[in-house]
C-alpha cells in the first residue's frame, strides 16, 4: 500500500506536438500499455466529491487507486488488488482496502453501489527530466484518441516554472485540461 501527494501539471497536445516531444525527449524509449478501468456510482458520487476510483492493469498487475483532493494536488491511495476488472462489473465496497472503504463510506457510497463503467487504454512513455518525471501519453477510449504531456513534481512552484519552460520550447501556452477520468465520462455522455 502507498499513499502519496500527487502534484502534476498536464497539457493536452495535438498529434504533431506529441511526435515532436517524443522525438526530443523519448527517442530511445518504448511505450508501455496500461488500461484504466473507471469505477463510479450510477449517480456519480465520486465525481461530486472531486474524486476518482480506478483499477489500473499494467504488465499483468492490478492496482486500485482512489484519488481525493488535497491542499495542493491530490492524495492517492494505491493498493495492489486481485480484482480482474471488466466493464459492467459490480465492485463490492467491503472487498476493497480499509482506507479506501473508509473514504467511500464518508462519501455515502453503499456496499454494492460501485461498478466499472468503462476503460481507457494508454500508451505511456516516461523519462526523468530535471529531477522530475516527464510523461507522454497517447490515450484511447471509445472512438477517441488524445495526447497529453504530464509533469509529476515534488514542489508546486519549482515544478510549474520547469513545466512552463518546457511548454515554451514547443510554443505551447499552459491550458490545464480536465483529467482523463473527466474526459472519459464527458465523452461517454455524448455517445
Regions found by a protein language model. Give the residues of each.
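Phosphate-end processing signature that detects enzymes handling 5′-triphosphorylated RNA
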Residues: 1-191
Amino acid at each position: 500500500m502507498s499513499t502519496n501527494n500527487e502534484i502534476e501539471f498536464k497539457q493536452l497536445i495535438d498529434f504533431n506536438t506529441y511526435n515532436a516531444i517524443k522525438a526530443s525527449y523519448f527517442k530511445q524509449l518504448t511505450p508501455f500499455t496500461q488500461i484504466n478501468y473507471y469505477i463510479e456510482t450510477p449517480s456519480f458520487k465520486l465525481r461530486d466529491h472531486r474524486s476518482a476510483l480506478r483499477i489500473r492493469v499494467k504488465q499483468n498487475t492490478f492496482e486500485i487507486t482512489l484519488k481525493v483532493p488535497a491542499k495542493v494536488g491530490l492524495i492517492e491511495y494505491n493498493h495492489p488488488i486481485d480484482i480482474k476488472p471488466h466493464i459492467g462489473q459490480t465492485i463490492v465496497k467491503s472487498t476493497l482496502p480499509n482506507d479506501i472503504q473508509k473514504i467511500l463510506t464518508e462519501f455515502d457510497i453503499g456496499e454494492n453501489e460501485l461498478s466499472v463503467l468503462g476503460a481507457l487504454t494508454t500508451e505511456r512513455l516516461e523519462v526523468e527530466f530535471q529531477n522530475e518525471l516527464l510523461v507522454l501519453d497517447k490515450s484511447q477510449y471509445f472512438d477517441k484518441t488524445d495526447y497529453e504531456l504530464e509533469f509529476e513534481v515534488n514542489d508546486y512552484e519549482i515544478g510549474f516554472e520547469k513545466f512552463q519552460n518546457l511548454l515554451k520550447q514547443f510554443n505551447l501556452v499552459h491550458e490545464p485540461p480536465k483529467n482523463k477520468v473527466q474526459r472519459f465520462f464527458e465523452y461517454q455522455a455524448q455517445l
